């Protein structure tokens, strides 16, 4: 899972002597499409507009603590939303990390839902 990868990277840095308070967690504002013939990504602002007749968004992966999309019942992509960002905010604070950053701003929706969620997650 992404948490295992993040934990491993953070541990490598802290084991090398970098203080956790100097590290930030980077999160994408897109979902990674990995099963398709041509893997790619889909921005959050496109995920929330997917046709609800074919796509189900906001399924929840309780192991990774992230939502994911299914297409006609099959896995399509995982991504972050307000809930998963809040969980990641709690996690980085528990590790004593500096904060969180994202890529990229233009992938957020017009209400800046994810940007606001990052702000809340880091500043609370």
Q: What are the residue ranges of the model-derived segments?
A:
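Short beta-strand and adjacent tight-turn residues that come in two discontinuous sequence segments
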Residues: 102
């Amino acid at each position: 899972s992404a948490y295992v990868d993040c934990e491993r990277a953070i541990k490598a840095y802290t084991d090398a002597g970098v203080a956790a308070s100097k590290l930030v967690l980077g999160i994408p504002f897109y979902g990674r499409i990995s099963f398709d013939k041509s893997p790619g990504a889909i921005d959050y602002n496109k995920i929330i507009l997917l046709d609800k007749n074919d796509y189900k968004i906001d399924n929840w992966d309780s192991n990774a603590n992230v939502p994911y999309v299914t297409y006609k019942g099959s896995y399509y992509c995982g991504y972050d939303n307000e809930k998963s960002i809040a969980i990641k905010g709690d996690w980085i604070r528990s590790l004593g990390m500096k904060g969180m950053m994202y890529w990229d701003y233009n992938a957020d929706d017009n209400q800046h839902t994810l940007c606001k969620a990052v702000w809340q997650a880091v500043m609370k």
